[in-house]
Amino acid sequence: MIPKGAIICIVLGVFGSCVVGLFFAAIANEAPTLVYVQGPSLSIMTEKTNFRLGEPINIKIINSGTVPLTFSDASYGLKIKQLDGIVFYSPLSAQIISILEPKEEKTFVWNQTKSDGSKIIEGRYKIVSNTDSTSGNMLEKSITINILK
């Protein structure tokens, strides 16, 4: 026969671990909060951090500052990289100067393919955007996402 104290400890341990697990699962998939600041600022946002393999990913590039930002192409400097820094996706875009006004945002949808059209595998990836360096204010922002099976 199992002592009452052991049963109480086991039940409380199982219940407590469920509560803690649910808490961490909720905060792990929270989207970051956008904060607007004075001066130049660039933000990248997705609706969540964890995505299923093959799920379209909406990427927002936002001017979260008070001055216009200049980009060297129509894709607003968007690149998808592996964590080791190798770029494997960059949208096809015209090489024209693009300007993002304060509080303006541009949305791109990435269908989890590489630039050569092949599908990616599950893993961690970095979404990066950077402004044109000729304007004097070189800004680069990145976020990390997880692709799960």
What are these regions (language model features)?
Residues 90-115:
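Intrinsically disordered, low-complexity Pro/Gly/Ser/Thr-rich segments with frequent PxxP/GP/PP motifs
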